């Protein structure tokens, strides 16, 4: 997941991403129909539930060449990459988002001059309003949950939810949002296009709390009686996000970074020895492991050490920070070279198109075009052989590697944990993951959400936590689809 890529974020309006129209691959092999699923983790039957979810087609990905097309084994891959935030580093989400909300709301009041009546209300009062991957409709002051066909399946104006008739009055009788449809049809070309002034999806837990900041600010404006034809709240929220995640603040000890560094255990789960042992077992089998994170190395080191231990770098053959996904998977090696950084001075020494697999060398930025060559040089296989990438950001970690490279993907979707029990779920699952206001992340009223559709078509396996994988041997055959079971509507 990306984090604290300040210059890049300004250039790209804080990583505004336009979703592609998901293609129905000819390689779709398996249809998962989840009805009265018994979820089994290890040897224990942990949970059982009845679901109404419609057929969910999972692909084996375009590059799938396994003889076991309906299963995934980590042992079948030559190289395996991991995202860091919300993948290997597991955050205490309620605490993290409370911190983010409080700082962003304070910025809106103290810097932008908005009334404090709603903004400084406790985050906990409306925590059920926050859900990952909501769309912000800037001009209308609305938040939108989008269906797989681009239909508005739920929407709010400020924090007030719209009735079905209000949704039709706003978005048309078919409830099809014009900007949402444009967003779906136009993939990354629209990242920096005109739609960036109108629409934004809140793709991760670092910007998800901004939905409530935006909504409460709209409430404030409406209460004043001076309702605008077009709202202009989002640019102020965006300024607050940029300010909060400015990496220069890491060394200055201010704000967000000061809170994280001074009490990392409040926001990050401690070392998970099962995951560490699992990573080591992959390396012992000769797999080349790479860590690819959008976070800056200074911040990444703090949270990685807390989650993976002081020798965390040795778990990987190469560590790359400030990766600037999704462009990492798209650009060529000449366009986006790797930067080698001298420690401890942090001086950028030189640019290299192709890095070396050395966990003690610090790399920033770069491209898949360069990394695949390095992986191939290390294991003697073209492009590194068969490659798997594991991450949580649906666009940066799931869609882009499949669309633009020959990688296959495993999606980490923590929202699954709201519906089922899995290894470690008693410690890892936050109560907010099942939104009391928006309902299931995966569907509403029996209609599959757009994000659920993207996950099903671009990931080979979708799990609630890396723990669900680490609890099994590396040659365990995971059935393609949701594991340990399908989430309900």
PLM features: what roles do these ranges have?
Residues 8-11:
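Cleavable N-terminal signal peptides of Sec/SRP-targeted secreted and luminal proteins
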Residues 14, 19:
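Cationic, low-complexity basic patches in intrinsically disordered or flexible, solvent-exposed regions
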Residues 2-4, 20-489:
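HAD-like aspartate-dependent phosphatase fold
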């Amino acid at each position: 997941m990306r984090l604290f890529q300040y210059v890049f974020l300004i250039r790209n309006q804080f990583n505004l991403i336009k979703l592609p129209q998901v293609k129905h691959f000819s390689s779709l092999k398996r249809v998962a129909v989840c009805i009265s699923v018994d979820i089994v983790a290890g040897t224990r039957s942990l949970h059982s539930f009845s679901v109404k979810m419609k057929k969910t087609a999972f692909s084996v990905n375009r590059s799938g060449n396994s003889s076991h097309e309906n299963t995934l084994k980590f042992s079948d891959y030559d190289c395996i990459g991991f995202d860091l935030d919300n993948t290997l580093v597991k955050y205490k989400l309620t605490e993290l988002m409370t911190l983010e909300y409080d700082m962003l709301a304070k910025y809106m009041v103290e810097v932008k001059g908005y009334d404090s009546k709603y903004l400084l209300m406790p985050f906990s009062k409306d925590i059920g309003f926050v859900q990952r991957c909501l769309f912000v409709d800037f001009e209308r002051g609305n938040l939108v949950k989008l269906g797989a066909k681009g239909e508005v399946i739920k929407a709010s104006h400020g924090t007030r939810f719209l009735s079905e008739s209000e949704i039709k009055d706003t978005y048309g009788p078919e409830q099809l949002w014009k900007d949402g449809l444009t967003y779906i049809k136009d993939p990354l070309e629209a990242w920096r296009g005109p739609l960036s002034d109108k629409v934004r999806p809140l793709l991760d837990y670092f910007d998800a709390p901004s939905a409530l900041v935006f909504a409460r600010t709209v409430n404030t404006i409406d209460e004043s009686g001076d309702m605008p034809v077009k709202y202009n709240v989002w640019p102020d929220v965006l300024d607050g996000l940029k300010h909060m995640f400015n990496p220069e603040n890491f060394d200055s000890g201010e704000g967000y970074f000061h809170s994280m560094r001074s009490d990392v255990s409040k926001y990050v789960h401690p070392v998970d020895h099962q995951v560490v042992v699992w990573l080591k077992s992959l390396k012992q089998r000769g797999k080349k492991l790479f860590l690819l994170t959008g976070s800056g190395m200074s911040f990444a080191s703090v949270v990685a050490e807390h989650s993976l231990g002081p020798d965390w770098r040795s778990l990987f053959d190469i560590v790359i920070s400030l990766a600037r996904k999704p462009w990492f998977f798209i650009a060529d090696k000449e366009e986006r070279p790797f930067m080698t950084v001298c420690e401890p001075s942090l001086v950028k020494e030189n640019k290299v198109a192709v890095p070396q697999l050395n966990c003690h060398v610090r790399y920033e930025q770069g491209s898949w075009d360069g990394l695949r060559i390095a992986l191939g040089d290390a294991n003697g296989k073209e492009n590194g052989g068969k490659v798997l990438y594991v991450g949580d950001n649906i666009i940066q970690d799931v869609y882009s590697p499949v669309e633009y490279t020959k990688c296959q993907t495993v999606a980490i979707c923590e929202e699954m944990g709201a519906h089922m029990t899995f290894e470690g779920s008693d410690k890892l699952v936050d109560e907010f993951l099942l939104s009391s206001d928006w309902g299931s992340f995966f569907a509403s009223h029996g209609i599959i959400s757009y994000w659920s559709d993207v996950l099903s078509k671009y990931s080979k396996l979708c799990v609630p936590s890396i723990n669900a994988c680490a609890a099994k041997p590396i040659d365990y055959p995971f059935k393609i689809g949701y594991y340990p079971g399908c989430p309900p509507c």
